[in-house]
Amino acid sequence: MPINIPDDLPAYKVLTAENIFVMNQTRATTQRIRPLKILIVNIMPLKITTETQLLRLLSNTPLQLEVELIHMSTHDSKNVPKEHLLTFYKTFKDIKENSYDGMIITGAPVEQMPFEEVDYWNELSEIFEWAKTHVFSSFFICWASQAALHYYYDIDKYLLKHKLTGVYRHHTNQRKMRRKILRGFDYQFYAPHSRYTTVLKEDISSNPNLDILAESDDAGVYLVASKDGSQFFVTGHPEYDPDTLDKEYKRDKEKPGVIAELPKNYYLDDDPSQEIQVKWRSHAYLLFSNWLNYYVYQETPYDLSDLHERKK
């Protein structure tokens, strides 16, 4: 949260120059505060697991959030009880007249398919288009980041020779450290990945509306942001639980015809009989709290009905 200090205090200029969020008294006295409306579009098969992971990260701030969950009405979810969907989830049709301060779209295990062959692609495309005028800032995870880059910027994804799985070291783009999403980041940090496809750095770098903020020598581009902070694309899975990659590895070993790739830098000494090394938790909390605080809470209009005018 910001600190509120007098406008003319010497520390104000020093801290501002260090990229510390300081709120002057003039702004503090005119702030109006309300709960933030956050929409989670959950397209992961294990919806209960994913919603729990995301809510855990979102809860790690003093901000009050009102969270709504939706699923794809054009897709039959087989790994979640129907009662759970009926009780806790809505569909896009139910909420499309609403506006939201923030939206998160999860990953999905469909990256080996062309986008247009995914059975809910038309519905998801409608959400992408709707978000332009009804969501202040959007956060796309793994496959959703690739899908959103494709929809908004015509950036393609490419099939990897082998599944990328593990916990990889990343480095921040030090020329972009003044971007608020990177506040408090170490120059190097770890994050999980689990995917069969990738996007190319040169495709993103050539777009003047996008910034690459973090990447990995082994896993490629990780964190991309639109210049205006309305869109964030995360190619990995910072929300993963400690044992998620372990469960995926054991699941893949049971699938006939599937080569189960050992998650890299995950087990002690890369030995699956050894304990899991959790290296990404602090990064995940910081990433989500920075997004919520700097790009949602501090910037969104108090009256969400104003969002339509701002987004035109």
UniProtKB/Swiss-Prot annotation:
List of catalytic residues: C142 (acyl-thioester intermediate), H237 (proton acceptor), E239
A family per Pfam: HTS
Catalytic function, reaction form: L-homoserine + acetyl-CoA = O-acetyl-L-homoserine + CoA
Enzyme type, top EC level: transferase
Broad class of where this protein is predominantly found: cytoplasm
EC number in record: 2.3.1.31
One Gene Ontology term, aspect cellular component: cytoplasm
Superkingdom to which the source organism belongs: Bacteria
Signal peptide (UniProt feature, chain positions): none
Residues given in the record as substrate binding sites: K163, S194, R251
InterPro entries: Class_I_gatase-like, HST_MetA, MetA_family
GO BP annotations listed: L-methionine biosynthetic process from homoserine via O-succinyl-L-homoserine and cystathionine
GO MF annotations in UniProt: homoserine O-acetyltransferase activity; homoserine O-succinyltransferase activity
Subcellular location: Cytoplasm
Site feature (Important for substrate specificity) residues: S194
UniProt keyword list: Acyltransferase, Amino-acid biosynthesis, Cytoplasm, Methionine biosynthesis, Transferase
Protein purpose: Transfers an acetyl group from acetyl-CoA to L-homoserine, forming acetyl-L-homoserine.
Similarity-based family: Belongs to the MetA family.
Protein name: Homoserine O-acetyltransferase
Lineage: Bacteria, Bacillati, Bacillota, Erysipelotrichia, Erysipelotrichales
Recorded name of the encoding gene: metAA
